[in-house]
Amino acid sequence: MRQKAGSYLAVFAGGAIGSVLRELLGFQLPGLSFLTATFGINIAACFLLGWLYAIRHRLHPHLLHLGAVGFCGGLSTFSSFVLELDQLTRMDGWSIGLTAMTLEIAAGLAAAILGEALGRGREARR
């Protein structure tokens, strides 16, 4: 029970930090469109999540929960991504919306793969 409580607290703390950072970054990037800011933040979270996955066996479970589930989960947001795609589609049409969706998913996957590769590369050098 203590292990689960510690994991829950780690997720809570990481989520709080990630969510606040996301909000701060949103305010710091006022010149960017809403879709561009969300895109950048989500891609950064995908990269970090891939890196954490690669080094997960070296991390205490609470630290992994804090970083992966909490921080990355709080930093990135699927709901904002979908809402912004909906708004983009309504303003600019389905082809633009589908293109943006495809690009963000592909970039997120590429970022996660790159983060994991860099994490594994670091592990190999140890």
From Swiss-Prot:
Organism: Ruegeria pomeroyi (strain ATCC 700808 / DSM 15171 / DSS-3)
Location of the protein in the cell: Cell inner membrane
Catalytic activity entry: fluoride(in) = fluoride(out)
Activity-regulation annotation: Na(+) is not transported, but it plays an essential structural role and its presence is essential for fluoride channel function.
Transmembrane spans: 9-29, 35-55, 63-83, 94-114
Organism superkingdom: Bacteria
An example Gene Ontology molecular-function term: fluoride channel activity
Family membership noted in the UniProt record: Belongs to the fluoride channel Fluc/FEX (TC 1.A.43) family.
Protein name as catalogued: Fluoride-specific ion channel FluC
